């Protein structure tokens, strides 16, 4: 009979007499029977959708279900279940050898092999008393495990305050998975006099706590908090410790302040043994219409430089109510970057936003309405000079106002109008030209003729520019203007065929292209150059009208660009497996418009541009670009890169770059090799591990090699380098990484980063994760925050 009763309940058949008795004894918490006549047909009652958290108001209305070998008791008073006893209500399930439920007090008592599953959190022990609705009670000699972190431990006693808060006495905690053999001890263990956990706030607080790792314990902490999930919480973060060749021993003790769900701040008191104390603060905010972040570092006295040091980095983004202004969109951005001195970028290379030598400060207001768009912007720079390699500061733009109009397919025509007014400010002596104002307009009209296999696009452009100068030019003029027309004709064809290479079927294309451009010569030698530079010679610029970027130089052109591209496309997925291209310019007349201190372009044939991109399988990728000079019969620029990525946590990338010197008399050009990798060393002895999912590694006991080397073949020296190892101990990860960064032609900074991460708990040391992510292509952290698992993944 007992087995039949349990089977009947599991098959959800009409209740047997024993089950009816149990429901009667739990009448206050039972489901109501249908009020229907005896002859009414049976119907299925809808089951509410499964929810992660049951609202508090519904907990007292939920039915209770019991199961066991023997059930006895008195109606409306108590129920006693013996043998394989279980009690289920909502997200609470209790299993025990003997279970007593007292209905007036809503109190459950369990004895013998007791197990509670409360929303996925599991508690096991010999004795329990618990009020079901409020989840108040105690559990003696308990073993527990939390769903969110997978962490757990043992306790002499746990007092349940409510469904979220519990207090464990003489407790331990670890995220190490318990092994089933005598004498097992976790790799790391937190022991505490009391351990208070709050699963709603996802935080644990331990008092009189010790942390042990591999049998070595720390001194006791009066109080220690740790996360029970990925949610943010205020408190001290684990300290970071590093060794730097310039700064010495580097210790940071950050404090995180969770101000609100949409605001937080982190304080970084940082002590460098060779420099002194640095105070850092980072603030972030997120609102419905605006967001931003700011970082401020302040060092009262730098012992090495014997002066005050500081750095500021801010970013703000704002969206306005565009409709009230009659616009489609209206937004603003503000970026502010400033440091105390020119040496800041070399001395503090760990602050990525402030390690550039050109620090931009700009504010912009952007708008759009229909075919119109525009912006009002101010832009200025702080230029950090370095005596061995000085740089010419760019002009500040105070202000820059742009307006653009784009109309597509207007009776078959495409029309655009781009306008720009800029007031340029700089040092006239250093720049060797006067400050001034420039008004620029570019009108463009094209008529595309398109078919599935061909395109022909004739286009005319008109460039107009007007200048006003604060000081006269070399010819005495205080103003100047320029008008330049341009005609271009872009054309191409696309052929397709079925092909087979190396036993694999493809759809192959052949795409010849011809691009002609004519721009008459206009003397621009006396005009200042505020923002123009030569375009890089690549596949993105070879089919463009102007040889220069910016608006101060419009190249005279009478040239034809010829090229052809072929692609191999997988017919099933549509993925591009390979692409090959070649292009060359044929110049019919000299290009006489040049930048200052450069000569006219007289070559009738340009260098040949060749490119290839191969993605034959998802594991392999090769990308090559070659600029070949047919007159000298040698390459003037080469870039070859390859990547091998056969699976998770396995990635090798290599690149070779060559750039010929601009002067023929100079020695060999600039050559460099760049290699990066992440690879499990266990592969060397045949241990391939297992894929546990994104951000979970490949199992414990595995070593990983990580690194990047950027080596200059010309200078025969390492430019930048990262070398390190990671060890995944399943519930802990160890990292040691050596980083070298060049801060000048003959100077470099080196630091060693050690980190010990207790998975799901805390990390000690200096984290190299940002360094590895920035330097290694497709680097995968061994652990990443993931969404908390559903309580139904651990459902009883």
What are the residue ranges of the model-derived segments?
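Extracellular and secretory-pathway beta-repeat/beta-biased strand scaffolds
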Residues: 4, 37-43, 242, 252, ...
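Short, intrinsically disordered, low-complexity terminal/loop segments
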Residues: 1-3, 73, 792-796
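N-terminal amphipathic/hydrophobic interface segments
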Residues: 33-170, 189-208, 267, 420
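Bacterial N-terminal signal peptides
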Residues: 15-27
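An N-terminal domain-start capping segment
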Residues: 28, 116, 240-241
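Outer-membrane beta-barrel proteins and related beta-barrel translocases across Gram-negative bacteria
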Residues: 121-140, 144-167, 171-190, 196-796
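N-terminal acidic, proline/glycine-rich, low-complexity intrinsically disordered segments
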Residues: 1-5, 31-35
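Bacterial N-terminal signal peptides that target proteins for export
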Residues: 2-18
């Amino acid at each position: 009979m007992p087995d039949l009763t349990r089977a009947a309940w599991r098959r959800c058949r009409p209740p047997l007499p024993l089950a009816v008795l149990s429901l009667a004894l739990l009448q206050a918490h039972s489901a109501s029977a249908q009020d229907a006549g005896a002859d009414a047909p049976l119907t299925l009652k809808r089951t509410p959708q499964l929810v992660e958290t049951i609202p508090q108001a519904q907990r007292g209305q939920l039915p209770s279900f019991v199961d066991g070998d023997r059930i006895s008791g008195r109606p409306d008073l108590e129920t006693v279940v013996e043998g394989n006893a279980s009690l289920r209500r909502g997200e609470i399930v209790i299993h025990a050898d003997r279970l007593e439920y007292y209905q007036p007090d809503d109190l459950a008592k369990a004895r013998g092999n007791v197990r509670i599953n409360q929303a996925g959190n599991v508690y096991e022990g010999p004795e329990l008393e618990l009020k079901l609705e409020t989840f108040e009670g105690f559990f003696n000699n308990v073993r527990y495990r939390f769903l969110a972190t997978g962490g757990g431990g043992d306790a002499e006693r746990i007092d349940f305050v409510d469904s979220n808060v519990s207090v464990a006495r003489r407790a331990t905690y670890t995220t190490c998975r318990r092994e089933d053999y005598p004498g097992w001890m976790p790799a790391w263990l937190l022991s505490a006099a009391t351990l208070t956990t709050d699963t709603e706030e996802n935080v644990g607080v331990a008092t009189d706590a010790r942390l042990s790792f591999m049998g070595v314990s720390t001194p006791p902490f009066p109080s220690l908090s740790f996360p029970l999930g990925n949610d943010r919480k205020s408190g001290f973060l684990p300290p970071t410790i590093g060794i730097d060749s310039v700064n010495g021993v580097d210790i940071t003790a950050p404090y995180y302040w969770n101000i609100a769900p949409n605001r937080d701040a982190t304080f970084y008191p940082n002590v460098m043994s060779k420099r002194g104390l640095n105070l850092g603060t980072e603030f972030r905010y997120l609102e419905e219409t605006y967001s931003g972040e700011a970082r401020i570092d302040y060092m009262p006295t730098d012992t090495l430089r014997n002066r005050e040091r500081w750095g500021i980095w801010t970013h703000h983004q704002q969206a306005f109510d565009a409709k009230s202004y009659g616009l489609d969109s209206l937004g603003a951005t503000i970026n502010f970057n400033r440091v105390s001195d020119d040496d800041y970028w070399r001395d503090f290379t760990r602050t990525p936003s402030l390690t550039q030598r050109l620090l931009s400060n700009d504010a912009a207001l952007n708008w759009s309405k229909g075919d119109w768009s525009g912006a009002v912007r101010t832009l200025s720079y702080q230029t950090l000079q370095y005596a061995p390699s000085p740089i010419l500061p760019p002009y500040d733009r105070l202000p820059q106002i742009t307006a653009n109009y784009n109309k597509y397919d207007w009776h078959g025509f495409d029309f655009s109008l781009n306008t720009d007014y800029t007031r340029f400010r700089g040092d006239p002596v250093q720049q060797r030209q006067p400050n001034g104002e420039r008004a620029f307009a570019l009108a463009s009209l094209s008529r595309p003729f398109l078919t599935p296999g061909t395109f022909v696009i004739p286009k005319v452009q008109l460039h107009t520019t007007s200048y006003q100068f604060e000081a006269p030019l070399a010819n005495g003029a205080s103003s100047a203007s320029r008008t330049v027309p341009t005609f271009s004709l872009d054309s191409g064809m696309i052929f397709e065929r079925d092909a087979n290479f190396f036993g694999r079927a493809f759809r192959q294309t052949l795409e010849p292209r011809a691009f002609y451009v004519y721009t008459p010569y206009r003397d621009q030698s006396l005009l200042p150059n505020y923002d123009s530079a030569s375009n890089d010679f690549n596949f993105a610029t070879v089919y463009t009208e102007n040889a220069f970027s910016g608006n101060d130089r419009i190249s005279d052109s009478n040239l034809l660009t010829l090229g052809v591209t072929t692609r191999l496309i997988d017919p099933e997925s549509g993925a591009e497996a390979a692409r090959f291209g070649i292009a060359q310019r044929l110049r019919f007349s000299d290009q006489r418009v040049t930048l200052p201190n450069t000569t006219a372009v007289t070559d009738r044939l340009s260098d040949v541009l060749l490119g290839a991109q191969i993605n034959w399988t998802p594991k392999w990728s090769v990308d090559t670009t070659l600029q070949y000079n047919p007159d000298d019969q040698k390459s003037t620029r080469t870039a070859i890169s390859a990547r091998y990525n056969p699976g998770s946590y396995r990635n090798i990338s290599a690149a070779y770059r060559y750039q010929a010197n601009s002067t023929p008399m100079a020695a060999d050009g600039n050559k460099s090799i760049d290699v990066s990798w992440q690879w499990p060393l266990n592969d060397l002895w045949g241990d391939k591990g297992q894929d546990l999912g994104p951000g979970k590694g490949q199992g414990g006991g595995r070593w990983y090699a990580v690194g990047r080397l950027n080596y200059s073949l010309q200078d025969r020296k390492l430019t930048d380098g990262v070398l390190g190892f990671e060890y995944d101990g399943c519930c802990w990860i160890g990292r040691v990484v050596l980083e070298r960064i060049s801060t000048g032609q003959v100077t470099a900074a080196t630091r060693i980063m050690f980190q010990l991460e207790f998975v799901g708990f805390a990390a000690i040391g200096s984290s190299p994760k940002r360094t590895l992510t920035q330097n290694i292509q497709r680097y995968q952290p061994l652990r990443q925050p993931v969404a908390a698992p559903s309580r139904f993944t651990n459902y009883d």
